[in-house]
């Protein structure tokens, strides 16, 4: 018999009477976000909902495609949309360095700049700054122990260009060298929020310190105190910037000549999510969840590094404390088994680079596990990658053709594999969402993972 786990702070009505929570602060232009719970998962913390943003709805739980530099690598926006993606996440660190947040601002914000017409998010840039590693001589990855598949040894939110560089942590912020030209930069919570407001996403994140799981308890405690102070400062700067009720005339010519509706969309106030840290320590994780939930954030992110076998426990520690009326994002996690775990424990949003990164390197998701398309056995396999898959790749090309492209080092290879992988993960989450609505989540989970993990 499954034990029933409930969150604190609020009790929802029975199924059939969804709760809608609109978020609006004094001085802000309009409701910036609305989160409606459609149905809760019996016996666990999971739920299906709808997150409304100024640029469209996100049906949660949902997978967020990572467009690090305002692009999903090897795909155009139409291909991303056709894969079922509803929301894209850009990286503040990379867009600040290139092309520069003011250029993105002058181009109409990240959505218009990259021609993505749906909801957008930006992270704070903190993970990339701290994952440079030199600040404490250790690398950071999202999961500290993974399977033996070599393709998974790449940290999930660690861009290829994030080679170790100099980074120095202070109480007020972090200084680091640009990986592009060696120039020195200093990021504070206020600076991160200013950059993200320029980038113009619908949902942004507070600046936090992402620690290495190998750090001792004393340092984890110090870093957590810093993260909480930075959260308060991020929130204060966000409120200051979002309090303006007039369109900023300092913006570039493309926005000054925009229609009123375009200006309204571009200047809509973003929702700000606070990030829970605390490493692998239960006391620190719970302490952080209490501290961050006491602040006036619109939603929450769970950050930091996890041991794969401990991830479910750590997520549950946090979610049993956070208020359930606000959306929750698990940062940098996106493997199929982890998606089921997160959703069961109340996570609404996930982001991860793996679908496209693995695709570009010839590793492809299927319901029976990953395949390496360049293996010899696929050279004469004229079946689609997945027989019942409705993605563009599977409807038009064979395994043999995709394998041929990879062996020939053709650019189309990574595109076709990425289309399939993104479709696979996005639609897996959509099917999980539907299983919550249909009251068969646990049956669907057991059936899928039995085939995928072969247990």
Can you say where each PLM-predicted feature lies in the sequence?
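Intrinsic disorder/low-complexity segments
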Residues: 1-30, 239-269
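Non-catalytic, usually N-terminal nucleic-acid engagement modules in DNA/RNA processing proteins
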Residues: 31-242, 376-379
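C-terminal extensions of enzymes
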Residues: 31-50, 58-67, 71-74, 208-214, ...
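Conserved, mostly hydrophobic/aromatic
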Residues: 56, 88, 123, 196, ...
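Short, well-ordered coil/turn segments that N-cap beta-strands
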Residues: 85-86, 116-120, 200-202, 268-272, ...
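Alpha-helical packing segments of well-folded alpha/beta enzyme cores
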Residues: 192, 223, 227-230, 234, ...
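Glycine- and acidic
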Residues: 212-217, 221, 298-303, 411-414
């Amino acid at each position: 018999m499954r034990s029933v786990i409930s969150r604190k702070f609020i009790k929802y009505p029975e199924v059939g009477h969804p709760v809608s929570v609109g978020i609006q602060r004094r001085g802000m232009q309009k409701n910036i976000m609305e989160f409606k719970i459609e149905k809760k998962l019996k016996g666990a913390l999971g739920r299906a909902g709808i997150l409304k943003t100024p640029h469209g709805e996100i049906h949660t739980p949902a997978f967020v495609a990572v467009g690090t530099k305002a692009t999903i690598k090897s795909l155009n926006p139409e291909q991303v949309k056709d894969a079922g993606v509803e929301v894209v996440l850009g990286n503040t660190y990379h867009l600040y360095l290139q092309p520069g947040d003011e250029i993105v601002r002058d181009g109409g914000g990240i959505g218009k700049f990259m021609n993505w017409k749906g909801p957008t998010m930006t992270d704070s840039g903190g993970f990339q700054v701290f994952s440079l590693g030199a600040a404490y001589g250790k690398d950071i990855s999202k999961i500290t122990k993974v399977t033996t598949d070599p393709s998974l040894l790449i940290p999930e939110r660690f861009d290829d260009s994030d080679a170790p560089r100099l980074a120095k942590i202070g109480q007020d912020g972090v200084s680091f060298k640009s990986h592009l030209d060696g120039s020195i930069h200093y990021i504070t919570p206020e600076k991160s929020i200013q950059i993200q407001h320029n980038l113009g996403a619908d949902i942004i994140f507070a600046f936090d310190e992402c620690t290495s799981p190998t750090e001792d308890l004393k340092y984890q405690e110090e870093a957590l105190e810093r993260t909480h102070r930075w959260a308060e400062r991020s929130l204060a700067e966000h409120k200051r910037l979002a309090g303006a009720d007039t369109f900023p005339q300092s913006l570039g010519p493309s926005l000054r000549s925009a229609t009123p509706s375009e200006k309204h969309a571009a200047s809509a106030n973003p929702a700000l999510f606070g990030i829970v840290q605390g490493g692998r320590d239960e006391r620190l994780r719970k302490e952080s969840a209490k501290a961050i939930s006491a602040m006036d954030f619109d939603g929450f992110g769970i950050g930091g590094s996890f041991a794969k076998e401990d991830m479910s426990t750590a997520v549950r520690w946090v979610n049993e404390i956070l208020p359930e009326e606000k959306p929750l994002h698990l940062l940098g996690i996106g493997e199929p088994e982890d998606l089921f775990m997160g959703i069961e424990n109340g996570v609404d949003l996930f982001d991860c680079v793996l679908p496209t990164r693995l695709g570009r390197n010839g590793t492809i998701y299927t319901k029976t596990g990953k395949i390496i398309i360049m293996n010899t056995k696929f050279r004469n396999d004229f079946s689609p990658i997945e027989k019942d898959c409705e993605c563009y790749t599977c409807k038009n090309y064979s395994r043999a053709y995709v394998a041929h492209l990879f062996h020939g080092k053709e650019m189309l290879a990574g595109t076709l594999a990425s289309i399939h992988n993104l479709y696979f993960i996005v639609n897996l989450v959509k099917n999980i969402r539907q299983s919550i609505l249909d009251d068969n989540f646990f049956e669907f989970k057991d059936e899928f993972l039995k085939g995928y993990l072969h247990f």
